[in-house]
Amino acid sequence: QDLLMRQTGYSLLRSNDNGDTWEGPFPVNTAPVARENSGGCSVGGSGGGHIVELPDGGLLMPLEGAITLDQTAYAPGGVGELCRVFTLRSDDGGNNWEYWATVAFDPANVVYMSEPSMTRLQSGKLVCMWRVQIRPGFRFDNMWFATSEDDGASWSRPARTPLWGYPPDLIQLQDGRVLAVYGYRRDEFGVRGCVSEDGESWSKDNEFTISTGGDADPSVVNQYWHTAYPSVVQCEDGTVVVAYHEYSKGELPLQEMWVTRFKMG
């Protein structure tokens, strides 16, 4: 059962006709990273955690997870191992996957890192950004990031951005800038974006609003705040498309998928 938990925490669907039909799900081997507790997240990522293709044909998948099976890690007063951000690699087109590298991990088990997104720049540099929470109260911190110059075999020291939100999705735009989109689950709620010249220098001055609202009435929906999880692409005509989820209006709020399309300034 321990081996099964380590190998079936994440699955993939595959399409050979540009998304018209799909096969799967196919279990992904994530060993030695295992499911971290029965009451929280399994090994996984975020909705926008793109798989990155390398020049040699290898594929990198950014994920989160913990190696030990500590069911008390996220309980009040827990001290067990928290999530790390790591990557899997496939060299056969995504049929088989193996652990490749840890992107970021706090051995003190104070910083909880999860829901990563990764993009490869034209220079060859990889940029990975992720959601962060801090013990003991698991407060939501700003997003953090790291970079790699060797196709993900090793990573820079993690750095904290000035951007609050979660989780992020990253792409490099046609003009070379890097765009991060992320959920904003406080105040007016919604989805926000921020551009960086190099994927490493991030400023609140470059933050903008993509959508607002989408949260539900907390007296009606327990997880009224569960919105966003954006995924972003840039079309050939240069427009940017962001997909995300939010609650509908009305007496019985339902989760709906929305798409916003816009041009970058």
Question: What function would you assign to each model-found segment?
Answer:
Residues Q1-G265:
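Asp-box/BNR beta-propeller blade signature and adjacent active/binding-site loops
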